[in-house]
A protein has these predicted regions:
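A beta-strand edge to alpha-helix "cap/lid" segment located at domain peripheries
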Residues: 23, 31, 66, 88-96
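Short amphipathic alpha-helical segments
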Residues: 14-38, 72-76
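Acidic-residue sensor for enzyme active/binding pockets
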Residues: 34, 56, 90
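Short, well-ordered beta-strand segments in beta-rich or mixed alpha/beta enzyme
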Residues: 2-9, 39-68
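Absolute protein N-terminus
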Residues: 1-2, 96
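Glycine-rich beta-strand-turn "strand-cap" elements at beta-sheet edges
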Residues: 39-50, 75-96
Length: 96
């Protein structure tokens, strides 16, 4: 299993708009519906007002690679350009 902790550092005051657009366009739901997806959830950190945390779990590397080719993933990259200044990705692999 592959786990990604993705921290989006948003432009000041833009985090809520970023998350609203993701959900309005169904990007989160589409990702959850992909083959091999186990978890795809957004969290709002209490301390960092402009950060948005995404926790993803994928069955294997093939599922994660396929995710990167989906139209909703491409759309997320376009949305990020408007709202996000930096993306930090932590990747973990487990034997599960």
């Amino acid at each position: 299993m592959i786990v990604l902790n993705v921290t989006y550092q948003c432009r000041p005051g833009m985090r809520d708009r970023f998350l609203e657009q993701i959900t309005a366009e169904g990007i989160d739901a589409a990702s959850r519906g992909e083959k091999g997806n186990i978890r795809y959830d957004y969290y709002l950190p209490i301390v960092e007002n402009d950060d948005l945390l995404l926790v993803e779990k994928w069955q294997d590397a093939d599922a994660l690679t396929e995710h990167g080719h989906q139209p909703h993933y491409v759309r997320l990259k376009e949305i990020k350009a408007e709202y996000v200044t930096e993306t930090i990705i932590e990747r973990f692999e487990t034997g599960e």
